[in-house]
Amino acid sequence: MKNLVVRTLSGLVLAAVVLGAIVWSQWSFGALLAVLLVGGMYEFYALAGKQGNAPQKVVGLVAGVVLFVLNFAFVSDDIEILGDARQAFGCGLAFLLLLLPAMFICELYRRGENPASGIGTTIMGICYVALPLSLMCYIPIVGSDTWNPWIMVAYIFIIWANDVFAYLVGMSVGRHRMFERLSPKKSWEGFFGGLAGAVAMGYAAARVLDADVWAWLGLALVAAATGVLGDLVESMFKRAAGVKDSGNLIPGHGGVLDRFDALLLSAPFVFVYMLFVM
């Protein structure tokens, strides 16, 4: 009972922080994504270390932060406070490009038994955590000339609706296992229940935002389907590392990757979908 109370309270606080940061301003949204990036990359590199890999944590984190800052600066309304935006962006991009070959140079002095593993897991952390969070910077402005945080809020609600309905339907009538090797409790019934919940939320979002209904129904399907795969991918990493949770930052919920795994994998797909459809 105590664990349920802790989980519920921390979940409510987390939801309030996430939604509040998105709605408050571009800068609070950017700060939220930056915190998730650092926490998520730290957890991923810890999981990689438990599997016998030796990622270059500092280099990876710096590259991830630079990638994020470049993308956030590109979409920020207040970019003028950073000076010459074009020059700053060019310098940042050049620095990021130099960090990639720097990984190979650093590996020369680490004397690791498996340098390819060290370099590979370092780059994986950037691709798995930093890239999706960087792309999220664009979601509130894709298809619009102005910043609209409610688009991001709607995307979050679609992911949450998918999780809730998948859990409820799976617990009630779930019989056919979806991916027992990685997640024994996931069922096909829960998967389709989650899709239905996500589509319903997508329809509601379209009505509230006065947007194209069919476009949002498609977005909901894309977000929900890839979100489930995101959960399975994180389960794959945790199972290989022999741990239940990626971290303990959020009481009763685990770490950043445990709570935002669906967003990490779905964000690139949602970004591309919105770019071409919305």
What residues fall within each predicted segment?
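Juxtamembrane interface at the ends
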Residues: 166-167, 171-172, 235-243
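Interfacial loop-to-transmembrane junctions
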Residues: 240-262
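Juxtamembrane boundary at the C-terminal end of a transmembrane helix
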Residues: 272-278
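Membrane-embedded alpha-helical bundles of polytopic integral membrane proteins
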Residues: 1-222
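C-terminal-most transmembrane helix of multi-pass membrane proteins
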Residues: 266-267
